[in-house]
């Protein structure tokens, strides 16, 4: 043993314990015995230093024990002297860390992915993806148009738009940090899951990815789409003179219309028409119906998105439609816009040349309009959870509307 002292029982022993335990000594006479030799009182401090050093080197599979040390030789008294021992066990602690690492890593990955999910507003990303597919299918004239190159063309439009959406979500949360602590405390920036620096890095990275990817494709419809959307929604969020457009209800509504009714469907259609299918530029009737449908629907979205957030918007001077008109009035106006959008869908279906397409799209939009009206009557405007749930519900109706509008010919 490399302590150099005998270990046995003593009526009042020193004890060594783990986790910051103490050596205690109370007015007792103890014998220090080192390798059968007597040590002088003068060398006591030197030997105690060696003992403490050797205790730190002492390794056992379990550290949760008490060890008793006999001191022989010279006698002395110690009054309330305490020695703190930091027990170090390399092998057991290393083994425990190794055993727990996989679980800890998995939990960390899950937490990061969950935070990123809420950071990126997944409901808008689903809407963008379905809008891209719906608009792209309007360019299809015959079944042979749907090929591998067609699917690649759709992805060329979807991926950069998803990247720019993550950038825009990040910018909005960076500038709405204090508002979101009231309106949306579950968001990762407001809750503290992501730091401000992390938000900046994520936003900048996805902005670069979006424009870089689109530039590689060389599609001018997609490049123009990104420029319009990135510039308008950046101006919507950032708090600098003449910008922060979300403070002005009319301008905020124009941002919504320019994105969802104009930039997205028109750019996706012309990307597929001119870049992928190599056909001349055009503006068919089906695209006109989709633009009209999305104009009314995006107006409804512009009004309804701020209804659950009235409290925080009032406190921070955001003059939204819901703040200006009141929740009830703004709510029923937005419901009217949604119903108008489904009315456009019914007219589009009625204009179709194919009988079954006419029936399916016309009846489908009528069913969606009925479901919307039924759901709207059950909303409690005084309950933030109820209004928030309705807002997510109208996005689901939009998803269904995209499928129906893709069939218009």
UniProtKB/Swiss-Prot annotation:
Co-factor note (free text): Magnesium or manganese or cobalt at a lesser extent.
Cofactor(s), names only, from the UniProt record: Mg(2+); Mn(2+); Co(2+)
Keyword presence, Transit peptide: yes
CDD domains to which the protein is assigned, alphabetical: PT_UbiA_HPT1
Membrane topology, from the record: Multi-pass membrane protein
Record pathway: Phytoalexin biosynthesis; pterocarpan phytoalexin biosynthesis
Induction data: Upon treatment with yeast extract.
GO CC annotation terms, alphabetical: chloroplast membrane
Targeting signal (transit peptide) range: 1-44
Keywords: Chloroplast, Magnesium, Membrane, Plastid, Transferase, Transit peptide, Transmembrane, Transmembrane helix
Catalysed reactions listed for this entry: (6aS,11aS)-3,6a,9-trihydroxypterocarpan + dimethylallyl diphosphate = (6aS,11aS)-2-dimethylallyl-3,6a,9-trihydroxypterocarpan + diphosphate; (6aS,11aS)-3,6a,9-trihydroxypterocarpan + dimethylallyl diphosphate = (6aS,11aS)-4-dimethylallyl-3,6a,9-trihydroxypterocarpan + diphosphate
Domain of life, per lineage: Eukaryota
GO molecular-function terms, A-Z: prenyltransferase activity; trihydroxypterocarpan dimethylallyltransferase activity
Main localization category: plastid
Broad class of enzyme this protein falls into: transferase
EC number per UniProt: 2.5.1.36
InterPro entries: AtHST-like, UbiA_prenyltransferase, UbiA_sf
Subcellular localization, as worded in the UniProt entry: Plastid, Chloroplast membrane
Bilayer-spanning residue ranges: 113-133, 148-168, 200-220, 222-242, 249-269, 287-307, 330-350, 354-374, 388-408
Keyword Transmembrane helix: yes
Family the entry assigns: Belongs to the UbiA prenyltransferase family.
Role played: Proposed to be involved in the biosynthesis of pterocarpan phytoalexins, specifically glyceollins. Can act as a prenyltransferase towards glycinol which is the direct precursor of glyceollins.
Record protein name field: Glycinol 4-dimethylallyltransferase
Encoding gene (name): G4DT
């Amino acid at each position: 043993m490399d302590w150099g002292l005998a270990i046995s029982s003593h009526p009042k022993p020193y004890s060594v314990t783990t986790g910051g335990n103490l050596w205690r000594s109370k007015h007792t006479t103890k014998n220090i015995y080192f390798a059968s030799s007597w040590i002088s009182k003068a060398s006591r401090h030197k030997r105690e230093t060696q003992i403490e050093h050797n205790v730190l080197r002492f390794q056992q599979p379990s550290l949760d024990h008490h060890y008793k040390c006999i001191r022989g030789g010279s006698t002395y008294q110690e009054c309330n002297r305490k020695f703190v021992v930091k027990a170090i066990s390399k092998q057991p602690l290393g083994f425990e860390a190794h055993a727990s690492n996989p679980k800890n890593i998995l939990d960390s990955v899950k937490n990061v992915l969950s935070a990123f999910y809420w950071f990126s507003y997944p409901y808008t990303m689903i809407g963008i993806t379905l809008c891209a597919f719906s608009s792209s299918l309007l360019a299809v004239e015959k079944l042979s148009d749907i090929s591998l190159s067609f699917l690649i063309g759709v992805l060329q439009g979807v991926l950069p738009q998803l990247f720019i959406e993550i950038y825009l979500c990040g910018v909005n949360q960076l500038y709405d940090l204090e508002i979101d602590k009231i309106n949306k405390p579950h968001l990762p920036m407001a809750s503290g899951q992501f730091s401000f620096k992390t938000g900046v890095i994520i936003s900048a990275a996805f902005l670069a990815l979006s424009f870089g990817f689109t530039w590689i494709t060389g599609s001018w419809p997609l490049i123009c789409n990104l420029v319009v959307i990135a510039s308008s929604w950046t101006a919507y969020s950032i708090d600098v003179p003449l910008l922060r457009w979300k403070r002005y209800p009319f301008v905020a509504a124009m941002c919504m219309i320019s994105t969802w009714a104009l930039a997205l469907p028109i750019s996706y259609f012309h990307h597929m028409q001119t870049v992928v299918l190599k056909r001349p530029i055009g503006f068919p009737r089906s695209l006109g119906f989709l633009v009209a449908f999305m104009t009314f629907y995006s107006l409804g979205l512009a009004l309804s998105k701020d209804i659950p957030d009235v409290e925080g918007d009032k406190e921070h001077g955001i003059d939204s439609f819901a703040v200006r008109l009141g929740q009830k009035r703004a709510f029923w106006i937005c419901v009217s816009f949604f119903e108008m959008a489904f009315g456009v869908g019914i007219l589009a279906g009625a204009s179709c040349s194919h009988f079954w397409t006419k029936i399916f799209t016309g009846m489908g939009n009528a069913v969606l309009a009925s479901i919307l009206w039924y759901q709207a009557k059950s909303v409690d405007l005084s309950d933030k959870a109820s209004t928030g749930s309705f807002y997510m519900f109208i996005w689901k109706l939009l998803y269904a509307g995209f499928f129906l509008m893709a069939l218009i010919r």
